[in-house]
């Protein structure tokens, strides 16, 4: 996978197949080789990049089998792009068994020229008992081992029923094989019953235990209603037969659900049928023609949702889109609640900050991954600082607004830990300008009017609520100095603030009071402060951290060959990375070092610490200053 854009676990990426690249996220429409209602060529203008067809149907149909072996799969289907083949697993689930074994099915897919072949895995249903589901996981793994030496891209499905630990086990087993593509199987019954919350457990326990360098496919997840949620959790591809199945039942797909033809009065303007038919005219078509036209509408709805999701990823606003869609159906809201229960996991893959503002809707917003990140830091901060602590509500201190008088008359006259209320929690006051604290757009809904929930966070610590007291005397501390140290601790790790910002640093402040840059006493630039409230380090600033933080903290280790180029200011490519700090946050500054821990450059990591070690193509760190540039 070559990553192009990312938004947490969601990504726009490309992977190569023998018949060209596929850019994800996308949908592979299911093509029935016996009945080609709409050809792949007709689908191309909608955004088609590949299709999926069933090798079992071809194998068991003599005419199709002979033609596929003679002319090849692509000639049979009439499509020159990437084709994935399924193995017949779902048919074995529906009909009880099929007449071919795993090796025969995979070998046939290879012989007819499938771009992505799938093993004959063992399907498990939501009702499958756990011991039986575990046997299916082991058998599916063994079947992958049977064909582990096959050439080409082999899809190794993740099974495990509704049991998160079995999904984890299956993912880890498949990840240890040569499978180059990972479908998540056995989920169609859950999709059909709108059991999206269970599906959340399945997806996330599969995704985080698979390599980030391989595509993840949600088998049978062909309705756009759940696309955004799935992509948010790291799914790259879907397949869809729903466009034609629903059409045969006179059901029209919309991004937010499905509607019966008998119950609609108007067609949406985006529908390809809008300027060609009235609803009555569609109803009056003969059955075959009507199904075909509705299928075209359904395909448009499916690809339109994929386009919207990709745009949200570019904007770094997919989380907002998911939050909005969650409120369109109770089953989606239940799924969203389940997603938020995984915030501590999701937070590891979220960027340091985003292009878009943080939208605060209601109490669900207090469970956002960014809130989890800040809460964890706040708890650590209070645990390590044994001073008295004051908590200031938004009535006294409002993030994003000038609080100069309050800073002068209160903060700088008492030596204490200062917390401010924000989005249903308490955060250190010094982080007031960092993302997402300042960059919040609030609904005005106060989920915790008496701050009882926020107080739970600080309950283990001795905290006094500020009641409007006035403090006399001289200034005992500098807010700006404490601010830059606190931001550095939050951004780079506890204790870093004092490492790089001594008492005698010079802090440049704009006319509006915002910090712009920090210099050493001698006038050397240490860092600049960005619009999101975080720092961009200079090479000199990075060297101060490097000299005091032990490896692997903040490090991306590269080969000596790469380090020479990085020292000149060139970016780091994934293929040259030898190791990285597991705790690196995407879009945060990192130290680029060689095998001997010699600092070569400082730059912005494009992905998280784990991802830095797993991707093999593209830019991993955008260097903004190398050693050679600094020395000039």
Swiss-Prot record:
Residues 553-628 form the PUA domain. SUPFAM superfamilies: Pre-PUA domain (SSF88802), PUA domain-like (SSF88697), tRNA-guanine transglycosylase (SSF51713). The active site is at residue 86. Substrate binds at residues 121, 186. One of its GO terms (biological process) is tRNA wobble guanine modification. Its cofactor is Zn(2+). GO terms for molecular function: pentosyltransferase activity; RNA binding; zinc ion binding. It catalyses: guanosine(15) in tRNA + 7-cyano-7-deazaguanine = 7-cyano-7-carbaguanosine(15) in tRNA + guanine. GO terms for cellular component: cytoplasm. Keywords: Glycosyltransferase, Metal-binding, Transferase, tRNA processing, Zinc. Belongs to the archaeosine tRNA-ribosyltransferase family. Exchanges the guanine residue with 7-cyano-7-deazaguanine (preQ0) at position 15 in the dihydrouridine loop (D-loop) of archaeal tRNAs. This is tRNA-guanine(15) transglycosylase.
């Amino acid at each position: 996978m070559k990553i192009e854009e990312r938004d947490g676990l969601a990504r726009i990426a490309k992977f190569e197949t023998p018949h060209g690249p596929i850019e994800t996220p996308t949908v592979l429409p299911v093509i029935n080789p016996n009945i080609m209602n709409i050809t792949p060529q007709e689908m191309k203008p909608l955004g088609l990049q590949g299709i999926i067809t069933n090798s079992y149907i071809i194998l068991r149909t003599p005419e199709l089998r002979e033609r596929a072996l003679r002319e090849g799969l692509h000639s049979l289907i009439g499509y020159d792009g990437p084709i994935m083949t399924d193995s017949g697993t779902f048919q074995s689930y529906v009909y009880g068994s099929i007449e071919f074994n795993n090796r025969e099915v995979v070998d046939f897919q290879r012989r007819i020229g499938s771009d992505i072949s799938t093993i004959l895995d063992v399907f498990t249903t939501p009702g499958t008992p756990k011991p039986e589901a575990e046997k299916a996981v082991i058998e599916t793994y063994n079947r992958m081992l049977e064909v582990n030496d096959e050439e080409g891209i082999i899809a190794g499905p993740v099974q495990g029923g509704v049991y998160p630990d079995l999904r984890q086990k299956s993912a880890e087993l498949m990840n240890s094989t040569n499978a180059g593509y990972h479908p998540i199987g056995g989920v169609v019954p859950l999709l059909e019953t709108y059991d999206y919350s269970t599906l959340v457990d399945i997806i996330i326990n599969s995704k985080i235990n698979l390599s980030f360098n391989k595509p993840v496919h949600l088998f049978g997840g062909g309705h756009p209603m759940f696309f955004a949620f799935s992509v948010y959790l790291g799914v790259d591809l879907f397949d869809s037969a729903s466009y034609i199945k629903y059409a045969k039942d006179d059901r029209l797909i919309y991004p937010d659900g499905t509607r019966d033809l008998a119950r609609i009065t108007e067609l949406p303007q985006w529908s390809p049928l809008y300027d060609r038919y009235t609803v009555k005219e569609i109803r009056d078509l003969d059955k075959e023609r009507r199904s075909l036209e509705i299928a075209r509408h359904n395909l448009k709805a499916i690809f339109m949702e994929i386009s919207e999701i990709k745009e949200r990823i570019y904007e770094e606003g997919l989380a907002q889109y998911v939050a909005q869609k969650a409120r369109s159906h109770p089953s989606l809201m239940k799924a969203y609640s389940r997603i938020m229960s995984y915030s501590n996991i999701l937070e590891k893959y979220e960027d340091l900050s985003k292009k878009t503002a943080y939208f605060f809707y209601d109490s669900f917003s207090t469970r956002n991954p960014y809130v989890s990140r800040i809460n964890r830091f706040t708890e650590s901060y209070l645990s390590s600082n044994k001073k008295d602590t004051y908590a200031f509500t938004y009535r006294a201190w409002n993030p994003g607004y000038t609080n100069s008088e309050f800073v002068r008359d209160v903060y700088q006259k008492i030596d204490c830990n200062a917390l401010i209320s924000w989005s249903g929690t308490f955060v250190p006051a010094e982080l007031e300008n960092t993302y997402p604290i300042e960059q919040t757009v609030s609904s005005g809904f106060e989920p915790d009017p008496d701050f009882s929930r926020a107080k739970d966070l600080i309950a283990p610590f001795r905290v006094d609520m500020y009641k409007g007291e006035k403090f006399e005397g001289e200034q005992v501390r500098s807010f700006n100095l404490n601010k830059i140290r606190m931001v550095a601790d939050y951004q780079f790790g506890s204790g870093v603030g004092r490492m790089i910002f001594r008492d005698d640093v010079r802090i440049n402040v704009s006319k509006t009071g915002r910090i712009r840059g920090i210099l050493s006493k001698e006038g050397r630039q240490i860092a600049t402060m960005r619009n999101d409230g975080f720092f961009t380090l200079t090479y000199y600033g990075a060297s101060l951290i490097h000299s005091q933080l032990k490896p692997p903290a903040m490090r991306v280790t590269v080969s000596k060959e790469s380090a020479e180029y990085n020292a000149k200011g060139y970016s780091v490519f994934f293929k040259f990375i030898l190791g990285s700090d597991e705790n690196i946050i995407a879009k945060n500054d990192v130290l680029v070092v060689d095998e001997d821990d010699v600092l070569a450059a400082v730059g912005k990591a494009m992905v998280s610490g784990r991802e830095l070690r797993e991707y093999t193509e593209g830019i991993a760190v955008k260097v903004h200053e190398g050693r050679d540039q600094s020395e000039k």
